[in-house]
Regions:
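Extracellular/periplasmic helix-loop-helix junctions in multi-pass membrane proteins
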Residues: 6-16, 101-110, 145, 156-175
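Alpha-helical transmembrane segments of multipass membrane proteins
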Residues: 31, 35, 87, 91, ...
Length: 232
């Protein structure tokens, strides 16, 4: 209902797109914080912990290093969420005042979209940070599950919201971001609860070669490439 045709198959929704773009800027604090604080504080402990496994560290040192690493991780994630919470609250509180000075033509509907999407992007930013930590611990299945849960929930609930009043647009993304945040956080808590087993017990005893669909496709194309045929 709020979409407009720009030209041909190119459509836009200015009443939604402009608030969405501005709301997205509110998560820059988390993006920067992950690089300058979370990784800076967490990675040295992470490297020390894994090097003890690789270099034959004693059990006591491994346990102490693991506890320190997880304590730093929990603290940094808490501060990240707190910074994003304060940023989101501040942006929502000041948006009516600031938008009044900008020639963007904000109406009540756009103000509602902006506030809804600020909350959604805040949850998404923190959830995405937790997902990146899952990748640090090589929990690819957990990270994939969290990403798919976000994609499915956001797409499904957004499609459902199209059946209601346009004032409810954006709540589908907000709910999907909440699902991502909770899924990634619960997965990280479960994964790190018994980290030594995850590192040692879930690794294969002998090396295994796994060939998925894309690997087989690549090998097939390589065998049938013109260069291979010329060499044959």
């Amino acid at each position: 209902p709020i979409g407009v045709q720009v030209k041909g198959l190119f459509y836009g929704a200015p009443y939604y797109d402009v608030p969405a773009l501005l709301a997205f800027l509110s998560i820059l604090v988390t993006t920067v914080n992950f690089v300058v604080s979370v990784e800076v504080q967490f990675y040295p402990r992470y490297r020390t912990y894994y090097s003890l496994f690789n270099d034959g560290g004693v059990v006591g040192d491994i346990t102490a290093a693991g506890e320190e690493m997880l304590a730093v991780l929990n603290r940094e994630l808490f501060y990240t969420a707190l910074k994003q919470l304060f940023t989101t609250a501040g942006v929502i509180s000041l948006e009516a005042l600031v938008m009044g000075y900008l020639p963007l033509g904000f109406n009540d509907l756009m103000h509602g979209y902006f506030r809804t999407l600020c909350v959604g992007y805040g949850l998404y930013a923190v959830g995405n940070t937790v997902l990146l930590i899952l990748l640090y611990f090589t929990d690819y299945k957990g990270a994939l599950g969290a990403a798919l849960s976000f994609a499915g929930a956001a797409a499904g609930l957004t499609a459902l919201s199209l059946r209601f009043d346009p004032a409810y647009y954006g709540f589908g993304f907000l709910a999907g971001a909440a699902v991502l945040f909770l899924t990634a956080l619960l997965r990280l808590d479960r994964f790190t609860r018994n980290l030594p087993y995850r590192i040692l017990g879930q690794q294969p005893v002998v090396a295994e070669e796994k060939a998925g669909a894309f690997t087989r496709l690549g090998l097939f194309l390589e065998r049938h490439s013109p260069q291979k045929k010329e060499e044959a």
